[in-house]
């Protein structure tokens, strides 16, 4: 994460602290020690948190989206063939835009904002246009194909543990952050548009990794994909995505790390 986006992290934490189950979810979880409070049941009117959350909505989120306009959003436009030019930045920069979208979704949940909602809708449409037919979404490779520079590696997924270039590709890292953002958006708006894009990518990952002879057994370079899968399970009461954690030692550790991070 680059310095320009770091300021967003703290601002995203406050709305996320009231992280909660979605419209069709059960409250509580057998493997999570804290029962989350649904967003719709949280209303702040104090003199400490509410002003800060208001600043998050009016200043921090717009500032972060403006920062993402420098390279991150243009990369998605190029992947969608809506803008000319090559990829800029690092491949994991895709995740920064997902993180900002996640924080914006929490902001919407705490303070409805028609303009912000419209901005998110436009970005979600862009994500859908950039996404490959099979669900793959990693702008560096989509723009440059197998000639993607740097840590991307020569083919999909192969460089997840940095075996080719020495630096992991962050394909699964980006995907994990997309899933988290999509779940947050669904919780805040009851709109499945972003969730459906994430489902398409997650289905591809679930199909790609596993115990089968044609499936990959490469452990991820970061626990974020496990965290995304666990967030899906926690928020939507669905075990649809565990990403082969019970088959691959690295993924099982990834899931356990994700549980610790969430707690």
Please describe what each predicted stretch is.
Residues 1-4:
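Positively charged n-region of N-terminal signal peptides that target proteins for export
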Residues 6-17:
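Bacterial N-terminal signal peptides
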Residues 20-263:
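Glycan-recognition and catalytic cores of secretory/periplasmic carbohydrate-active enzymes
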């Amino acid at each position: 994460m680059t310095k320009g986006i770091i300021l967003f992290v703290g601002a995203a934490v406050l709305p996320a602290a009231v992280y909660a189950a979605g419209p069709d979810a059960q409250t509580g979880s057998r493997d999570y020690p804290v029962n989350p409070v649904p967003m719709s049941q949280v209303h702040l009117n104090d003199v400490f948190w509410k002003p800060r959350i208001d600043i998050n909505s009016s200043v921090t989120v717009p500032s972060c989206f403006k920062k993402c306009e420098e390279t991150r959003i243009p990369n998605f436009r190029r992947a969608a063939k809506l803008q000319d030019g090559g990829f800029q930045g690092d491949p994991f920069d895709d995740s920064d835009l997902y993180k900002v979208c996640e924080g914006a979704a929490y902001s919407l949940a705490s303070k409805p904002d028609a303009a912000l909602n419209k901005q998110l809708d436009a970005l979600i449409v862009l994500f859908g246009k950039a996404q490959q037919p099979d669900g793959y979404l990693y702008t560096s490779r989509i723009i440059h194909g197998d000639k993607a520079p740097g840590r991307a590696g020569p083919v999909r997924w192969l460089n997840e543990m940095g075996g080719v270039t020495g630096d992991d590709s962050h394909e699964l890292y980006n995907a994990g952050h997309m899933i988290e953002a999509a779940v947050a958006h669904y919780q805040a708006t009851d709109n499945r548009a972003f969730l459906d894009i994430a489902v398409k990518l997650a289905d591809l990952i679930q199909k790609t990794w596993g115990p089968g002879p044609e499936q990959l057994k490469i452990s991820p370079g970061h626990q974020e994909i496990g965290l995304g899968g666990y967030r899906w399970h926690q928020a939507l009461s669905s075990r649809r995505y565990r990403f082969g954690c019970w088959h691959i030692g690295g993924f099982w550790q990834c899931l356990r790390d994700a549980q610790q991070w969430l707690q």
